[in-house]
Swiss-Prot record:
The gene is RIB7. This is 2,5-diamino-6-ribosylamino-4(3H)-pyrimidinone 5'-phosphate reductase. It catalyses: 2,5-diamino-6-(1-D-ribitylamino)pyrimidin-4(3H)-one 5'-phosphate + NADP(+) = 2,5-diamino-6-(1-D-ribosylamino)pyrimidin-4(3H)-one 5'-phosphate + NADPH + H(+); 2,5-diamino-6-(1-D-ribitylamino)pyrimidin-4(3H)-one 5'-phosphate + NAD(+) = 2,5-diamino-6-(1-D-ribosylamino)pyrimidin-4(3H)-one 5'-phosphate + NADH + H(+). Keywords: NADP, Oxidoreductase, Riboflavin biosynthesis. Its EC number is 1.1.1.302. InterPro entries: DHFR-like_dom_sf, RibD_C, RibDG_C, Riboflavin_Biosynth_HTPR.
Amino acid sequence: MVLLPLKKDLVPFLEPYLPDEERDADKEKPYVILTYAQSLDSRIAKIKGTRTFISHEETKTMTHYLRYKFDAIMLGCGTVMIDDPGLNCKWWPEDEKPEHLAGISPRPIILDPNCKWKFADSKMKKLYEAGDGKAPIIVVKELPSEPEEGVDYLVMRTNFTGKMDWSDMLVQLKSKFNVKSVMVEGGGIVINDLLQRPNLVDALIITLGATFLGSEGVEVSPLVEIKLKDVSWWTGDLDTVLCSRLVTH
């Protein structure tokens, strides 16, 4: 995939919402942004279980610029099993062309409580073996009986409802794997869950594609009202980008 040049005005626009090692050094958890593309009717996919392209070329370049800026990129296993993404980075500064993309790529973190996804069969592994991507950290309820080679596992704690303890998982990522910043890309369940945890999300970067996907699409809509602050908008040729922070209670 050949990327379009990064729009120059995106760099200062995004800067206030990106990680800063000095500012974030004393924090127990990594710096976390929630970033995804949605349609005008708040859908992230046209039909459940299918891959849908919403953003356009200029904001695809922005996505890879963000990947260049973060230590790790997080997705739920459902999205990974549908899309089979590489999750590497294909953007770099003009004067810093890397020999291999692994050196500039974020580390994938896959939320896979029940060990459904297989690294061995994935595009991620092909990129890893070619030196163009990193091997993942897989977040599980318990270690699999046959751990996959090259993979690191993080055994998550659950809260009183049996759901993943987000706070503990993020703290473990920083303390055990030195992950200082994470961009969370999806899917729908993960996005909706984190939107309701403003104390864990440091910034929100949403790409709005110029399309409606219809009522059968996968909707992003938290159960409760969520208010935003520090809101900024960027408008491109076909997409608009919203950057903000979540109001904490």
